[in-house]
């Protein structure tokens, strides 16, 4: 990568992506490599997180580093009015790496511009989630044996879903076909569709979630409707249960179909799907550890073969 920070997946070339995925595979084979001894990482989570924060902290610990940080911004000086710039500059005095989640779009990029310490974007509003994209790409390649020429169906909150926005960019190097399934209120934004058009990516939009669409699919990417992104709770109530994947909907699906979900789920995947061998979302979350270990080493310029 040209930058030592990872704030957006569009920083990564095809070669960058494949190198990070190859390194993630090496970490899956042996996650306990003491490559960060003597280094400290800060996890600054201004928004709630379970998987992303814990997997990043586990990644640092398994690499021999130490972690400081917070998961509740109300306990920090930002609750007293401290600016994001000042928070970043203060934390930069203590650490070698900052991993940050923030509700404002562009916050991670801004942080990377005010400090020389590498920044990893762990999610900025509805904008980007590049480390999730890497673990998604790792999961796709692991289950499909390839990344090229796959049909990916994205279902649910495509308007505010930063994971689907990032995944479109990450997959753009590999000639995918997309199906976007969403109610009109949560349809894929024009920015992402224009990106597809510019890069020659095929896509279709749907408001109905049907077995016919599922049967054309290699990767079924389910998402929850995010209550925290709505200012109108009546609108949220109207759309929150609009699509629910049930096990019987998979009866004629492709053998290679795998179901992904960035988690947490609410009601969009019925629990009877969990025992289907095509359900991969729990393993997908586990892959986050290896992908994030690879990302950390990438931004710090550490060779994992040392």
UniProtKB/Swiss-Prot annotation:
GO terms classed as biological process: 'de novo' pyrimidine nucleobase biosynthetic process; 'de novo' UMP biosynthetic process; amino acid metabolic process
Annotated binding of carbamoyl phosphate, by residue: 51-52, 101, 129, 132, 263-264
EC identifiers of the protein: 2.1.3.2
Gene Ontology annotations for the cellular component aspect, listed alphabetically: cytosol
InterPro entries: Asp/Orn_carbamoyltranf_P-bd (IPR006132), Asp/Orn_carbamoylTrfase (IPR006130), Asp/Orn_carbamoylTrfase_sf (IPR036901), Asp_carbamoyltransf (IPR002082), Asp_carbamoyltransf_Asp/Orn-bd (IPR006131)
PROSITE patterns membership: CARBAMOYLTRANSFERASE (PS00097)
Pathway(s) this gene product operates in, as recorded in its UniProt entry: Pyrimidine metabolism; UMP biosynthesis via de novo pathway; (S)-dihydroorotate from bicarbonate: step 2/3
Tagged with keyword Transferase: yes
Catalytic activity: carbamoyl phosphate + L-aspartate = N-carbamoyl-L-aspartate + phosphate + H(+)
Binding, L-aspartate: 80, 162, 224
Assembly, per entry: Heterododecamer (2C3:3R2) of six catalytic PyrB chains organized as two trimers (C3), and six regulatory PyrI chains organized as three dimers (R2).
Family: Belongs to the aspartate/ornithine carbamoyltransferase superfamily. ATCase family.
Annotated protein name in UniProt: Aspartate carbamoyltransferase catalytic subunit
The gene coding this protein: pyrB
């Amino acid at each position: 990568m040209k930058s030592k920070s990872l704030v957006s997946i569009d920083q990564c070339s095809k070669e960058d992506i494949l190198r990070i995925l190859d390194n993630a595979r090496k970490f899956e084979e042996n996650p306990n490599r003491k490559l960060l001894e003597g280094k400290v990482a800060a996890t600054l989570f201004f928004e709630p997180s379970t998987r992303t924060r814990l997997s990043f902290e586990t990644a640092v610990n398994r690499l021999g580093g130490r972690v400081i940080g917070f998961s509740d911004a109300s306990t920090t000086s930002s609750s007293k009015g401290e600016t994001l710039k000042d928070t970043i500059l203060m934390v930069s005095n203590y650490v070698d790496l900052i991993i940050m989640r923030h509700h404002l779009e562009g916050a991670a990029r801004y942080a990377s511009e005010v400090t020389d310490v590498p920044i990893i974007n762990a999610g900025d509003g509805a904008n980007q989630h590049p480390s999730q994209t890497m673990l998604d790409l790792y999961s796709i390649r692991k289950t499909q044996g390839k990344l090229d020429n796959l049909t990916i169906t994205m279902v649910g909150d495509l308007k505010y879903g930063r994971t689907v926005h990032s995944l479109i960019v990450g997959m753009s190097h590999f000639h995918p076909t997309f199906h976007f399934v969403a109610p009109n209120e949560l349809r894929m934004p024009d920015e992402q569709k224009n990106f597809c058009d510019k890069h020659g990516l095929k896509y279709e939009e749907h408001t109905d979630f049907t077995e016919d669409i599922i049967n054309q699919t290699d990767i079924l990417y389910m998402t929850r409707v995010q209550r925290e992104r709505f200012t109108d709770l009546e609108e949220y109530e109207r759309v929150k249960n609009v699509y629910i994947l049930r096990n019987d909907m998979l009866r004629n699906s492709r053998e290679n179909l795998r179901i992904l979900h960035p988690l947490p789920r609410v009601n969009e995947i019925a629990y009877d799907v969990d025992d289907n061998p095509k359900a991969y979302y729990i393993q997908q979350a586990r892959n986050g550890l290896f992908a994030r270990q690879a990302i950390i080493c990438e931004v710090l310029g550490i060779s994992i073969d040392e």
